[in-house]
Swiss-Prot record:
One of its GO terms (molecular function) is DNA binding. Keywords: DNA-binding, Transcription, Transcription regulation. Residues 134-192 form the HTH cro/C1-type domain. Residues 145-164 bind DNA. Gene3D superfamilies: lambda repressor-like DNA-binding domains. This is Putative HTH-type transcriptional regulatory protein MTH_967.
Amino acid sequence: MDKSIKREHVLREIHELLASNGFETSHIYERSCFDLMARRKLLLLLLKVLVNIDGINSLQAHEIRTLAHTFLASPIIVGVRSKTEPLKEDVVYERHGIPAVAPETFRNMVADGEYPEIIADRGGYYVHIDGKTLREVREEYNLSLKDLADLAHVSRKTIYKYENGLARASAETAMILEEILNIRITLSIDIFSVPDRDEIEIKPSGRLADIGFGMIETHKTPFDAVAKEIKFDNTVITNLEKERDSRTLRRMAVPLKDLSLVSGSESVFIIDNPRINENIEGIPVIKSWEIGEMESSREFLKVIAERKTCS
């Protein structure tokens, strides 16, 4: 792909690709830590599109991973090149814990269901070996660990590690093993996975904490925070008043509604101004003092449901 390619062009192509392959897509949010959200059945994607995948920093990546875990979404970077070379097709790269692939690789996954097998890492390109298949076929050929190791020009210990899932193989070694055994032994990489929760901070936050919600504050998103129901795991995208005027709140309601529809989450404004109606452009409004009178997260969600249709 030409180095002069514009990010906007790649982003538009990815958006069109998703829409034409059965995904419900959000608007594009270029000033956010993520560019768009897309859903197809149970698969929810949180995408960042870059020309140079090294352009993402650790803080942006952390926020993307946090949101992905909260929404049970798969974070992914689609990029054209790194700072040193173009991204290769059907190879998975990684930046700050987020998988990164070339547009062609992403297209293969979305349109054709073909997933990459090769991982780019320090020192070269690697694959995951199907250890069970490797052991079964080796034994069918009556080959010992040492026999197969000698044929593949690796150590007996290396073959043992492959069979027990203790090591990745270089792409070259995997190819040699497949030629020897006449069978595919490499595994496709599932990059549509949800990040682990061990690094995610869900902070108790005032009145919401009292009724069973944790709050995840965001810094570079089209919304202010995400409230996570601790007991039942429901998610609510939240905008706070922050002394914003009615016109600004109406403008902010558009991405709130858009993202809540795609993510399957609830959305709400939490504000102090008593003059604001109970609904802004289809988004329910709850006053801060009302939360103090609620007894549970269920009551909070019930009020949201009731106020969706308020005029």
